[in-house]
């Protein structure tokens, strides 16, 4: 009788000894972080690309969408070359980490870690260990890239309709390296604001305040659009703009839900609070439009949605849901006031041509959210996510100290972005014009790219403003009449509601 030796058991899909599944890796955490990264990516691609291509005048649809597309792609390359480790690597300075690539498998397949995030008490004892999520470094690199990319895409909203695309191509990598990485390390990567106790749960300061301030600063240096464009900048497709806004709203589930670096209770609270704040802010903004202007504005509703999402971001996982509703009410009213009332009364604000009012929807809403988080953050939720023991808002016993920290963090981010953005643009301006020429601005996409979003004219013919046969007005009473260049270009714009700033 021959006995057959049993073959050794084959590793199953959930066994811990698979080469690709080390003991520290949690498959659920990995799956959620990749999904969250994808959600945030969808906010930029196609969310903001669609919004930018539809909310602007028809002649700027291609250029506006491409500015977002280019920013997204260029950010990824710079991020893996040096940017990620400048924002989340080993400490170099109190506000900056050491540069280095995130390209080798030796680095990317190891357990993710934030090396500078350990927090020590005043006596030198370790109070909070460094953050080490249960997935590979590659997942963290991807997730944090999406945050960096959307910051630059948001910044572009201040510059639509006149910035030289070559200057924009030079600006994006420089701003990422010298501005974004500083804010990210200071507040998230273990820098001095992180260690001091400034709360920025998911980017109210790192992303929204920085993009709003930098966008406004860049708009000042680049200069305004043509007078005719500033006076009439009608969206070319409001329905498409709403679709892009919907992608932005739903994608925020990954934005705030992925911030704890795990699918835990903090993430669930954050996602619920995010939606509540967005809805409340949208309704508040719409009601104010009806009260003061007699009718609801669809563009205003999208702006209100945006400010609600931005305002809740600094504290999404740290406040009660009733607090999220309160924050939504402030988000729908304070930026509305600064945009619709204060802006029009300020000579300086009127001088700076912030195309999509990014300063109001992101900088103002971001600071507002940071301040309200300093008031409303609960000790129970802070204990689950914050690095310093006993963190809480003013209304829960922190005293005025936490509010002071929130204001101090906002001041640092504002001043840094003001100085660095100005320096970058002044340097670029020595070699590349920041603004397109007036002749190019009259034409738009065709001058900038040789392409048009809506290129068919008449019976399948591409419209060409330089060819008389395609610009003559026919029909009864109009045969043989030629419009002036200004009239033809004006007629190309869509009719509809516009953002009047």
Curated annotation (Swiss-Prot):
Signal peptide: none annotated. GO terms for cellular component: plasma membrane. PROSITE patterns: AMMONIUM_TRANSP (PS01219). It comes from the Eukaryota. InterPro entries: Ammonium/urea_transptr (IPR029020), Ammonium_transpt (IPR001905), Ammonium_transpt_CS (IPR018047), NH4_transpt_AmtB-like_dom (IPR024041), RhesusRHD (IPR002229). GO terms for molecular function: ammonium channel activity. Coiled coil: none annotated. It holds the Pfam family Ammonium_transp. GO terms for biological process: ammonium transmembrane transport. It is found in: Membrane. The chain crosses the membrane at residues 35-55, 64-84, 140-160, 174-194, 203-223, 238-258, 274-294, 298-318, 322-342, 356-376, 412-432. Keywords: Ammonia transport, Membrane, Transmembrane, Transmembrane helix, Transport. Involved in ammonium transport. Belongs to the ammonia transporter channel (TC 1.A.11.2) family. This is Ammonium transporter 2 member 2. The lineage of its organism: Eukaryota, Viridiplantae, Streptophyta, Embryophyta, Tracheophyta.
């Amino acid at each position: 009788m021959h006995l057959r030796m049993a073959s050794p058991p084959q590793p199953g899909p959930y066994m811990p000894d698979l080469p690709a599944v080390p003991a520290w890796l949690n498959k659920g955490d990995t799956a959620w972080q990749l999904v969250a990264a994808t959600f945030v990516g969808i906010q930029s691609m196609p969310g903001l690309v669609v919004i930018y291509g539809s909310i602007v005048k028809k002649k700027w649809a291609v250029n506006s969408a491409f500015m977002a597309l280019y920013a997204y792609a260029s950010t990824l390359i710079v991020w893996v070359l040096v940017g990620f480790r400048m924002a989340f690597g080993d400490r170099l300075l109190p506000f900056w980490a050491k540069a280095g690539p995130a390209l080798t498998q030796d680095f990317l397949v190891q357990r993710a870690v934030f090396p500078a995030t350990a927090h020590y008490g005043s006596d030198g004892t370790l109070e909070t260990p460094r953050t080490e999520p249960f997935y590979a470094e590659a997942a963290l690199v991807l997730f944090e890239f999406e945050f960096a990319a959307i910051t630059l895409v948001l910044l572009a909203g201040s510059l639509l309709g006149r910035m030289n695309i070559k200057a924009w191509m030079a600006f994006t990598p420089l701003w990422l390296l010298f501005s974004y990485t500083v804010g990210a390390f200071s507040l998230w990567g273990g820098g001095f604001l992180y260690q001091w106790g400034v709360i920025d749960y998911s980017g109210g300061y790192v992303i929204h305040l920085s993009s709003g301030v930098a966008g406004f600063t860049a708009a000042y240096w680049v200069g305004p659009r043509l007078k005719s464009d500033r006076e009439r900048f009608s969206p070319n497709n409001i329905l498409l703009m709403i679709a892009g806004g919907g992608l932005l709203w739903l994608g925020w589930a990954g934005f705030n839900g992925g911030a704890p670096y795990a699918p835990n209770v903090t993430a669930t609270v954050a996602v619920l609070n995010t939606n509540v704040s967005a809805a409340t802010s949208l309704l508040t903004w719409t009601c104010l439009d009806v009260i003061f202007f007699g009718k609801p504005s669809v563009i205003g509703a999208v702006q209100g949605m945006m400010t609600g999402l931005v305002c809740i971001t600094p504290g999404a996982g740290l406040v009660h849901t009733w607090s999220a509703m309160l924050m939504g009410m402030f988000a729908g009213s304070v930026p509305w006031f600064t945009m619709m009332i204060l802006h029009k009364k300020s000579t300086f604000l009127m001088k700076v041509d912030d195309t999509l009012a990014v300063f109001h929807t992101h900088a103002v809403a971001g600071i507002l959210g940071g301040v309200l988080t300093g008031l409303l953050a609960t000790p129970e939720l802070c204990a689950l996510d914050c690095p310093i023991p006993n963190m809480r808002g003013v209304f829960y016993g922190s005293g005025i100290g936490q509010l002071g920290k929130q204001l101090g963090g906002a001041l640092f981010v504002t001043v840094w972005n003001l100085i660095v953005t100005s320096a970058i643009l002044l340097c670029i301006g020595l070699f590349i014009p920041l603004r397109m020429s007036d002749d190019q601005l009259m034409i738009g996409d065709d001058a900038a790219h040789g392409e048009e979003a809506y290129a068919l004219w008449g019976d399948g013919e591409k419209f060409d403003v330089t060819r008389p046969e395609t610009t003559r007005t026919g029909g009864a009473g109009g045969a043989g009449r030629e419009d002036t260049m200004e009239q033809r270009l004006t007629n190309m714009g869509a009719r509809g509601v516009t953002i009047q700033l």
